[in-house]
C-alpha cells in the first residue's frame, strides 16, 4: 500500500475569485480530456470511507475519512470499466473495458491490492454491467442474468434470469447491519400481468433455489403492465421477498439503505423521488426533485436513514429529509385525495408521467411550478398505505421541509420567525431569476395551505409539492457530468465566510468576489459533510446545516487525476 500523500489540488471554494477559478478549472478540464487518466467509473465503498476510480490506464483509490488522501494507485495498460471495493480491505473486483488485447468486459478479476496478485478470474456469457460486494455476497449483473456468489469461497450460489436490464440497475444492502440480517438485493421487475385475481411476475426464473420455475411473489402492485416496479430478493435465503410498485415509467435509479429497511427510486423522468418500506412495500415519502425531466444518475441514503441524496445531469445534488414532518405532509395529501375519491368515484387524479412532455433541461433548480403527473399511481390508495415515521427520529424545524423556503425566508414578512431557523442562502448561487421563482412558489404554497381542502387534487398537488430540504450546485465545467454523492452522519464545525451567507436585499445578483481578510470574517457553523465525486475527476466536500437546510456550502475541492 502506498503512503497517504498530500493533496495536489486543494481549493477552498469560499475564498477564491470566481473568474480566476473558472479559468483555472476550464484549463484543467481541457487537459483532462486529452490525458491518459480519463475517468471511466467512480464509486464509494460500502461505508463511504474510500473512493475508487476506474481509469483509462488503471485505477486509483482515495481515502475520504477522516482525512482526504490517495492510498493506492495501480497503473497498467488496461482501461478499467468497473471497480468495486470490499469496505477498506485489500480485496477489490475490477472489470476491463475490453479495449486492449487480453481485456474483456465479460471478465471479472478479484485482486488483492496488498499482495498485488489476482485471486481469481471469472468469465461470463455477456458484458458485466454491475458488480456489488458485501461481507458475505458478491452480485454480478449482466443484461439478462444476475449471479450471486459467496464471497468467502467464490462459490456460485444462485442465478436469476431477468428481463433486459441494459442500464445495469441493481442495489445491495449491507449484511448483518446492527444485528439485522437484512441482506437484500433490489433490481427492476419484468412487466406484470393479472391472472385469476392474483399478480404473477413474468419471466423470473430462480435457478439453484427451491423454485426453479415462475415464482408467485408477494406484491403491492395493483396495475398490470407496469415497467417501473422493483423486486426485493433475499440474498441469504435466496428467495424473492416482494415486488414494490414504484413508478409506471422505466426506472432510472434505485438504492437500498445500508440496513436494508428502505428503498428509494426514481423514474426516467427524474422529477419524482419515492421512498418505500422494504418490509411492507408501502410508500413512506414522495418528493418532487424538479419540474422538467432530467437524468438522475444516483440515489443514496445517509447511514442513519435521515436523508436521501439525488445526483442528476442538471449538475445539482438534491437532499431530501426523511422526517416526521415530511411523512405527515405526504399523508395529509393522500387523505384529501381519498376523501375526494369517496365523494366522487369518477374523480380523476393526476395523470401518469407524460412521455411527450417538454424535454427541457433544468435551469438552476428546476423550480417552476408545473405538474408532471408522476404521482398518480399512488393517489388512489387508501390512507393506510402511508406510514408515519416515529417522532423519536428527530424534531424538525417549522417550514424546513420545502427547499424553496431556503431562498425567500430571508425576505419573509414574518417578524416572529427566528433568523437562526431560516435556511442558509448561498450568495454565489443567488440570481434574480431564482428569487422570482422562489417568491412565486412561496405564494403558491401559502395558497395551497389555505385552499388545499377546496381545490381539486390536480391543482393542490401542483401548488404544494414536498420538495428538497437542501441542495448544492456542482462546480463542473461541462454539462451532463456524471456524479455520485454521499452524506456523513457526523456533525463537524466549519468556518465559513460571513459574506458567503449574508443576504443583500437591495442587490440580489451574486457577488463576484468573496475574500477573507481576517479571522473575524469567518463564521463557525455546525455542518454535515456531503462528499461529491464527478467524472471530471474532482472531489468536493459541501457543508449542510442539519437544522436549517437550504444551500450547501462548498468547503473543499480536490483534483484526483494528478
Curated annotation (Swiss-Prot):
Coiled-coil positions are none
Per UniProt, the short sequence motif L/FRRG motif occupies residue numbers 287-291
Task: Tell me yes or no: is Mitochondrion among this UniProt entry's keywords.
Answer: no
Q: Which GO terms describe its cellular component?
A: cytosol; endosome membrane; fungal-type vacuole membrane; PAS complex; phagophore; phagophore assembly site membrane
Instruction: Enumerate the Gene Ontology biological process terms.
Output: cytoplasm to vacuole targeting by the Cvt pathway; late endosome to vacuole transport; pexophagy; piecemeal microautophagy of the nucleus; positive regulation of vacuole organization; vacuolar protein processing
Which regions are flagged for Basic residues bias? 331-342
This one is known as: Autophagy-related protein 18
Q: Which organism is it from?
A: Debaryomyces hansenii (strain ATCC 36239 / CBS 767 / BCRC 21394 / JCM 1990 / NBRC 0083 / IGC 2968)
Q: Which gene encodes it?
A: ATG18
Amino acid at each position: 500500500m502506498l503512503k497517504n500523500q498530500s493533496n495536489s489540488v486543494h481549493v477552498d471554494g469560499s475564498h477564491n475569485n470566481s473568474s480566476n477559478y473558472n479559468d483555472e478549472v476550464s484549463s484543467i478540464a481541457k487537459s483532462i480530456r486529452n490525458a491518459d487518466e480519463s475517468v471511466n467509473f467512480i464509486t464509494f465503498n460500502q461505508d463511504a470511507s474510500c473512493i475508487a476510480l476506474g481509469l483509462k490506464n488503471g485505477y486509483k483509490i482515495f481515502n475520504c475519512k477522516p482525512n482526504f488522501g490517495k492510498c493506492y494507485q495501480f497503473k497498467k495498460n488496461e482501461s478499467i470499466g468497473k471497480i468495486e471495493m470490499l469496505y477498506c480491505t485489500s480485496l477489490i473486483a475490477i472489470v476491463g473495458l475490453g479495449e486492449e488485447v487480453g481485456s474483456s468486459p465479460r471478465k471479472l478479476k478479484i485482486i488483492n491490492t496488498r499482495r498485488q496478485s489476482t485471486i481469481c478470474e471469472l468469465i461470463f456469457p455477456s458484458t458485466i454491467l454491475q458488480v456489488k460486494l458485501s461481507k458475505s455476497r458478491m452480485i454480478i449483473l449482466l443484461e439478462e442474468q444476475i449471479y450471486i456468489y459467496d464471497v468467502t469461497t467464490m462459490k456460485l450460489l444462485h442465478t436469476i434470469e431477468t428481463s433486459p436490464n441494459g442500464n445495469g440497475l441493481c442495489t445491495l444492502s449491507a449484511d448483518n447491519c446492527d444485528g439485522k440480517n437484512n441482506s437484500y438485493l433490489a433490481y427492476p421487475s419484468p412487466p406484470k400481468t393479472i391472472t385469476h385475481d392474483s399478480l404473477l411476475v413474468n419471466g423470473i426464473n430462480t435457478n439453484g433455489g427451491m423454485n426453479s420455475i415462475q415464482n408467485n411473489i408477494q406484491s403491492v402492485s395493483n396495475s398490470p403492465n407496469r415497467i417501473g416496479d422493483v423486486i426485493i430478493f433475499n440474498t441469504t435465503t435466496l428467495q424473492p421477498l416482494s415486488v414494490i410498485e414504484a413508478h409506471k415509467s422505466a426506472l432510472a435509479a434505485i438504492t437500498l439503505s445500508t440496513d436494508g429497511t428502505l428503498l428509494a427510486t426514481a423514474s426516467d423522468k427524474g422529477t419524482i423521488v419515492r421512498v418505500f418500506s422494504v418490509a411492507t412495500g408501502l410508500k413512506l415519502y414522495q418528493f418532487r426533485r424538479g419540474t422538467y425531466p432530467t437524468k438522475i444518475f444516483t440515489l443514496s441514503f445517509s447511514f442513519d436513514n435521515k436523508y436521501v441524496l439525488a445526483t442528476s445531469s442538471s449538475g445539482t445534488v438534491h437532499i431530501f429529509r426523511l422526517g416526521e414532518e415530511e411523512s405527515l405532509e405526504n399523508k395529509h395529501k393522500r387523505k384529501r385525495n381519498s376523501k375526494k375519491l369517496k365523494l366522487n368515484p369518477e374523480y380523476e387524479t393526476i395523470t401518469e408521467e407524460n412521455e411527450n412532455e417538454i424535454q427541457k433541461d433544468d435551469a438552476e433548480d428546476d423550480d417552476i411550478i408545473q405538474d408532471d403527473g408522476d404521482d398518480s399511481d399512488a393517489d388512489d390508495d387508501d390512507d393506510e398505505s402511508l406510514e408515519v415515521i416515529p417522532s423519536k427520529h428527530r424534531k424538525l424545524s417549522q417550514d424546513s421541509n420545502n427547499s424553496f423556503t431556503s431562498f425567500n425566508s430571508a425576505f419573509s414578512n414574518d417578524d416572529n420567525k427566528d433568523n437562526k431557523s431560516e435556511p442558509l442562502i448561498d450568495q454565489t448561487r443567488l440570481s434574480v431569476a431564482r428569487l422570482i421563482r422562489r417568491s412565486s412558489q412561496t405564494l403558491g404554497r401559502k395558497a395551497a395551505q389555505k385552499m388545499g381542502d377546496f381545490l381539486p387534487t390536480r391543482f393542490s398537488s401542483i401548488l404544494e409539492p414536498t420538495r428538497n430540504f437542501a441542495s448544492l450546485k456542482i462546480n463542473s465545467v461541462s454539462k451532463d457530468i456524471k456524479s455520485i454523492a454521499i452524506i456523513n452522519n457526523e456533525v463537524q464545525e466549519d468556518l465559513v465566510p460571513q459574506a458567503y451567507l449574508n443576504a443583500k436585499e437591495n442587490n440580489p445578483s451574486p457577488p463576484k468576489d468573496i475574500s477573507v481578510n481576517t479571522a473575524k470574517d469567518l463564521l463557525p457553523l455546525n455542518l454535515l459533510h456531503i462528499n461529491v465525486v464527478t467524472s471530471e475527476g474532482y472531489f468536493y466536500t459541501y457543508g449542510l446545516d442539519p437544522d436549517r437546510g437550504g444551500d450547501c456550502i462548498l468547503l473543499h475541492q480536490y483534483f484526483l487525476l494528478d
